[in-house]
Design a protein with these regions (language model features):
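Gram-negative outer-membrane beta-barrel transporters
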Residues: 57-73, 89-173
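Transmembrane beta-barrel strands of outer-membrane/channel proteins
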Residues: 6-10, 19, 63-69, 116-120, ...
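Transmembrane beta-barrel domains of outer membrane proteins
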Residues: 5, 9, 48-52, 104-108, ...
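C-terminal beta-signal and adjacent terminal beta-strands/loops
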Residues: 12-13, 73, 110, 152, ...
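Outer-membrane beta-barrel translocator domains and adjoining extracellular loop/strand segments
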Residues: 18-23, 30, 75-84, 121, ...
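Outer-membrane beta-barrel signature, preferentially recognizing the C-terminal barrel domain
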Residues: 1-3, 10-71, 82-108, 136-140, ...
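A general structural signal for well-ordered alpha-helical segments in protein cores
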Residues: 46, 158, 243-244
Length: 253
């Protein structure tokens, strides 16, 4: 069973009132609105090819290969102030492009549900406007796995999610040499575990752990003269956390 889909979309987004006029201040950073923001416009292309099969032993297979390309004009984004690195100002990026491909496979058998996927995404290099020799897109890989099992006799679902984010390349401008130098953010691993238990007819109990590997920050490095030098860190998460909750779902039939 094959399914091919191709789509095109023309996008338009006006800046929100928050982006135009809202100013936010706290102890760590400041965000400044910009009343001169222009509306975003974009062209988006997507495509996917999916394959499904159910074997005689009732194993269900699904594989999806997809790709996308986005071309955005006047992208609304945050820029660091030249006077203070703790101040972020909303601005328009004249050009921005993203592209990528992904492959996902899902296998379902009885109470098991296993999904494995990967993607390769290219992010626009803003410095290419100043130096045409730089690559237009900077590529980064991701891989993820989700394993779920349903304990049907006791009404319990357990799910383990894992994701690897590969190193993300970039460029920085060296004021000393007046050159663009390649940089990169290191890759990292994330994992979550959740459980859901049905209680009575309308209640369910959920609990689990997020960010099991306790990832908080990732090192950035600058690559120059075949030497990797530390260039600070990027904060990406709050660390490991645990949660538990009780939910109520009422459906009148």
């Amino acid at each position: 069973n094959l399914d091919l889909r191709i789509a095109y979309a023309r996008g338009f987004r006006s800046p929100s009132l928050r982006e135009l006029y809202f100013n936010f201040f706290d102890a760590n950073h400041q965000i400044i609105g910009n009343p001169d923001l222009k509306a975003e416009t974009s062209h988006s292309f997507t495509g996917s090819l999916s394959w499904k099969k159910i074997s005689p032993s009732e194993v269900a297979y699904t594989t999806i290969f997809s790709g996308f390309y986005n071309n955005v004009t006047n992208l609304i984004d945050y820029a660091v102030s030249a006077n203070d690195p703790n101040i972020f100002i909303l601005t328009n990026v004249s050009k921005s492009k993203t592209a990528g491909v992904s492959l996902t496979s899902v296998v379902k058998y009885k109470n098991w549900n296993v999904a494995v996927g990967g993607s390769y995404t290219g992010f626009y290099n803003v410095y290419v406007e100043e130096d045409k020799e730089l690559p237009q897109l900077q590529w980064s890989a991701e891989a993820n796995t989700n394993i779920g099992y349903n304990f049907s006799k006791i009404g319990l679902d357990a799910n383990l999610f894992y994701k690897f984010t590969g190193k993300k390349p970039g460029y920085v401008f060296d004021n000393t040499t007046q050159e663009y130098i390649q940089s990169e953010m290191k890759g990292y691993h994330m994992a979550d575990f959740t459980m859901n238990k049905k209680l009575f007819k309308h209640f369910s109990l959920n609990a689990g752990a997020k960010n099991i590997f306790n990832v908080k920050s990732i090192k950035n490095s600058v690559i120059g003269n075949s030497v990797h030098a530390s260039n600070g860190i990027s904060n990406i998460a709050y660390g490991r956390s645990y949660f538990a909750g009780l939910s109520f779902n009422w459906n009148k039939k």
